[in-house]
A protein has these predicted regions:
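Short secondary-structure boundary segments
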Residues: 1-14, 116, 169-178
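Short, charged, amphipathic alpha-helical segments
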Residues: 111-118
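Membrane-interface aromatic/basic loop that binds lipid-linked glycans or pyrophosphate carriers
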Residues: 124-179
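Acidic helix/loop microenvironments that form the catalytic cleft of cell-wall polysaccharide enzymes
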Residues: 118-124
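Conserved nucleotide-sugar donor-binding catalytic segment
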Residues: 1-83
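Short, conserved alpha-helical segments within structured domains
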Residues: 45-46, 115, 162
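Catalytic core of nucleotide-sugar-dependent glycosyltransferases
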Residues: 67-73, 79-110, 134-146
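Soluble or luminal CAZymes and related metallo-dependent hydrolases
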Residues: 5, 42-45, 85-96, 118
Length: 179
């Protein structure tokens, strides 16, 4: 996520634009001894863990491989999101995370309020990206979040939006070639 080892401010941890693997996090155990209820109510544990520790100060990112992450595990939370009603699961995830961020905001006495609001907005936008809600993805409201996407992601969003038939044909062809 970052190009070198560096200090990451608490504000950046809360309102992060990049992802770092949970398995690479090193946290002080005292931060995790008495966890608030919103940690347990949240469907994922990595983000609450990160922002809870941010209440106590900055973090440090070490730019090297720290662990190995198993990908494609069928029983993982991520894999479970792709079965059934994907749009509903994405909306449920967003609502759950929104509640967690709001509880964290209160728990941290609103010290990071603007970062929490920005993180909620980014998460809402990324939910729209995941379900391909082009009206919202391309709206002025999410202009800054759209700019944060890499060129490849922005290209494919516009390709799919403006030329859906061609996009589906190319996608179908590419998937058949993978097999």
């Amino acid at each position: 996520p970052y190009e070198k080892s560096m200090r990451i401010t608490a504000k950046e941890v809360i309102n992060k634009r990049t992802h770092y693997p949970t398995a690479s996090l090193l946290l002080r155990s005292e931060y995790m001894k008495s966890l608030p209820q919103y940690y347990f109510d949240c469907k994922v544990g990595d983000i609450p863990m990160q922002i809870i520790s941010a209440k106590y100060g900055d973090a440090y990112y070490i730019d090297r491989v720290m662990s190995v992450y198993r990908m494609g595990v069928p029983t993982s939370w991520t894999a479970s999101q792709f079965s059934g009603d994907y749009k509903k699961k994405q909306e449920d995830y967003y609502q759950n995370m929104k509640r967690m961020y709001e509880a964290y905001d209160k728990d941290s006495d609103y010290r990071f309020h603007s970062e929490v609001e920005a993180a909620k907005k980014r998460l809402r936008f990324l939910t729209y990206v995941n379900v391909r809600d082009f009206k919202n993805i391309l709206s002025k409201r999410y202009k800054n979040e759209y700019k944060e996407l890499d060129f490849r992601e922005r290209f494919f969003i516009k390709f799919e939006y403006f030329l859906p038939g061609v996009y589906n044909l190319v996608r179908k062809t590419a998937l058949s070639l993978k097999k």
